[in-house]
Amino acid sequence: VNALLYHWGRESIPELKEGQVSKILSNRRPGIVHRLDKETSGIIITAKNHDTEEFLSAQFRNHSSIVKEYIAICIGRPQHQHGIIQTNIIRDPKERKRFKAVVGTEEGKPAESYYECISCYGEYSLMKVRINTGRTHQIRVHMKYLNCPILGDGIYAHQDKKFPKATLMLNARLLKIKIPGKEELSIFKSPTPERFIEVMKVLKRDYTK
């Protein structure tokens, strides 16, 4: 983020006095048009100037033309090979750090996720998820709702006996978005993280699909 401050230039950032950088960053976060949960890896796009920031941000706000795809290693097998999860998401009244999926109520914010089970190994599943909204913890909450919490999720899943040291197995692997000056969607891809590769090696060794 500090690098983005530099790229935005003096004309867009007020003259700074010592100790003011953190305050401006917390209020403005220049160039940051979307975010990932703390332990989620993968693609994040930023802007170098205000016009580009507005152009990109509008697509995230309106969910227009943009495609966001993730992969996740989950604990459990989904009942169906693929499907759409449509719920509202609210903050869990019993635990303020958690969110939960609810249906049949106007409470909370609507959230929609499309999932596809790529393969299963024992009681683990490799999932592809595309989100049509961008709620906090959306994929993590929806996988929990599906009874397939994400491996390594310290909030929505129990510590796994087979992979007790696993971190959150969620990776933003693909982003399709319009960028200024181009008519067609630009495609950005993230390589598979090493931690995913190591877990998949163990699953393929110990289980058949």
What are these regions (language model features)?
Residues 104-112, 122, 132, 136-209:
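Pseudouridine synthases involved in rRNA/tRNA modification
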Residues 22-24, 35, 62-64, 103, ...:
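Short secondary-structure boundary/capping segments
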Residues 4, 45, 72, 115, ...:
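Residue-level signal for inorganic ion chemistry
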Residues 1-84, 88-93, 189-203:
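RNA pseudouridine synthases
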Residues 75, 129-132:
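A structural micro-motif recognizing beta-strand termini
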Residues 29, 40, 66-69, 81, ...:
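A generic structural signal for well-ordered coil/turn residues at beta-strand boundaries
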Residues 74, 114-117, 150:
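Conserved hydrophobic positions within beta-strands
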Residues 36, 77, 118-120, 153:
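Residue-level recognition of beta-strand microenvironments
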